Regions:
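Cytosolic ends of transmembrane helices, especially the final helix of ABC transmembrane type-1 domains
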Residues: 228, 252, 296-327
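Helix-to-loop junction immediately C-terminal to a conserved catalytic motif
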Residues: 395
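Conserved "ABC signature" C-loop
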Residues: 431-476
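An intracellular "coupling" helix at the cytosolic face of ABC transporter transmembrane type-1 domains
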Residues: 24-31, 119-120, 136-145, 149, ...
Length: 556
């Protein structure tokens, strides 16, 4: 049984080599801040060692062991102190200003990667967990790449410089002080493995807490109507208890490890102090020399202690990198220029079958249907019959296990791919408005839409009420369209779809909250354009009456 098995340390999901390659790619996007931090750190090392020499020289001049001007010595010390202040100010500026830019850049890259990846039909991570990773783990990785690595270079430089300085004063003690360090390096491998496991547990528990908080706030109205306030608070307490237990366990392990480490360094410092005192008693070391002696020992032990403290930092960044790499596991969708087709367009399903990864049977099996150009089709079926799955297949969000989805017009036909999504506009069921003004929401359909185009889309979607609001298009919607009724939010969503103006329109229960008269007027407006191919997922007879054909899906 090896050490990993003895201490029940699990095999990590990714090897250290794979994680280092991922971190290297991430570092290349943050080189400027890393290089500046490293340069400032190395200059700080030079200033710090120069201060040791300046203090020794000033004390020896004051005690008469060395000739020179005490005013000149103090002046040099003051200059070095000012240099240290200036370097610290530069370090703070680089860390704060460039640091937030680096973090923003990585968050943007990760979000872009998530949005361009294939969707498997079911999310593998809770949205609260994803947010936790994009906020906390990205911050950990950026801090490591732009601060920890440059600081490590400075620490190593300080260690080497202080050792050489001490070696020039006393060779034996220099080797004694440095000789105990490999012992801690050998112990660090076991420490890192155990701490990595504990840190991963803490981060996962932290994600669970954020997920509970997010869901509770998101569904606050439902929770109040179900009178489940105490249930959700108890659920939060349960996840927090798990987090607290794991934090206590990790902290206890860290405290014991740090105690052993600090005890070793304290013994080393006492040995150095005793050695220097004996040399002073023999008059082979001046008081200034002893001061420099002890300062150098601190400057050797300090970097050595900092290097050992890097172990939990490495653990944290390895854990954060693993969690971010998991977000990149889904393959990217096909990338390239959009492929628009001239309207009117149709969609033809040829022997389509689809089953989700965790499903025992096909949701859709051997389906053939033609949504011909300019048609209006109602898709009907009981819950679980595959209506929403069909929409996802038509939008190329999912890919059929068997068969083909063909997009065609009078001139050409092509097998559907994500690059053809530009030919569709989709209005999902429920409230799909986002935080911001009504104008912001509408321009998600067409970024450069003019005021006239927006007003026309609102009229077509029976949403002219927007212009009668006190702030009109600049009325602010809170999260999920807060401040508007369900019917108002649906009509604004339809107006957004009309602004997008694509040849094929898909509506998933998009008129469910509308009264019959408004629904009739809206359907009449939508179907007045004969170049559009319209597909309704619906249960409402009033919608079916407006359609040219129907598709009945049967539950498999």
């Amino acid at each position: 049984m090896n050490i990993r098995q003895w201490f029940k340390i699990p095999t990590p999901k990714y090897s250290a080599k794979v994680i280092f390659k991922w971190l290297w790619r991430a570092w290349r996007g943050n080189q400027l801040q890393a290089i500046l931090n490293a340069a400032i750190g190395l200059l700080s090392v030079v200033v710090s060692l120069a201060q040791v020499w300046a203090v020794q020289h000033a004390i020896d001049v004051a005690s008469g062991h060395t000739e020179g001007s005490i005013y000149w010595s103090v002046g040099v010390m003051a200059l070095l102190v000012l240099c240290g202040f200036a370097l610290r100010i530069c370090s703070i500026w680089v860390r704060n200003i460039l640091g937030i830019k680096a973090q923003n850049r990585m968050q943007q890259r990760m979000l872009d990667r998530i949005l361009r990846s294939e969707w498997t039909g079911k999310e593998s991570h809770h949205s609260g967990d994803v947010l936790n990773r994009l906020e906390q783990d990205v911050g950990t990785v950026v801090s490591f790449l732009t601060e920890t690595i440059p600081n490590t270079i400075s620490v190593v430089a300080m260690f080497v410089g202080a050792f050489l300085y001490l070696f020039s004063m006393d060779k034996v003690l220099a080797f004694v002080i440095v000789g105990i360090i490999p012992v801690f390096v050998l112990l660090s491998k076991l420490y890192i493995g155990q701490m990595r496991r504990l840190t991963r547990q803490v981060r996962d528990s932290d994600s669970k807490v954020q997920s509970v908080l997010q869901e509770t706030i998101q569904h606050r109205m439902l929770i109040k109507t179900l009178e489940s306030d105490s249930v959700m608070v108890d659920r939060l307490e349960s996840t927090q208890s798990e987090l607290r237990h794991r934090v206590v366990k990790r902290t206890a392990f860290s405290v014991v490890s740090n105690f052993i480490l600090n005890a070793g360094f304290s013994v080393g410092y006492l040995i150095a102090f005793l050695w220097a005192a004996l040399r002073m008693a023999d008059q082979t070391l001046t008081f200034g020399g002893m001061t420099a002696f002890l300062q150098l020992v601190n400057r050797i032990q300090g970097p050595a202690r900092d290097l050992t403290r890097l172990a939990p930092v490495f653990v944290g960044v390895f854990t954060a990198a693993e969690r971010l790499m998991e977000l990149e596991e889904n393959p990217l969708e096909e990338q390239g220029d959009p492929i628009p087709l001239t309207a009117p367009c149709g969609v033809r399903l040829e022997h389509i079958s689809y089953a989700y990864d965790d499903g025992d049977s096909n949701v859709i099996e051997q389906l053939n249907f033609d949504f011909y150009p300019g048609s209006c089709t109602a898709v009907l079926g009981e819950t679980g019959a595959g209506k929403t799955t069909l929409i996802r297949l038509i939008l190329a969000l999912l890919h059929p296990n068997d068969g083909k989805v063909i997009l065609y017009n009078q001139q050409e036909q092509k097998e559907l791919s994500p690059l053809m999504r530009c030919n569709f506009v989709y209005v999902p069921q429920g409230n799909t408005l986002m935080s911001g003004t009504i104008r912001d929401n509408l321009r998600l359909g067409k970024l450069n839409a003019t005021e006239e185009e927006i007003k026309t889309a609102l009229e077509m979607s029976c949403a002219s009420f927007v212009m009668e609001l006190p702030d009109g298009l600049d009325t602010v919607c809170t999260e999920a369209g807060g401040g508007l009724s369900e019917g108002q939010a649906q009509r604004i969503s339809i107006a957004r779809a009309l602004l997008r103006n694509r040849p094929i329109m898909l509506f998933d229960e998009a008129t469910s909250a509308l009264d019959p008269e408004t629904e009739r007027q809206l359907l009449h407006n939508i179907l007045s354009n004969h170049d559009k191919t319209v597909i309704f997922i619906t249960h409402k007879p009033a919608v079916v009456d407006y359609c040219d054909q129907t598709l009945h899906l049967q539950k498999q």
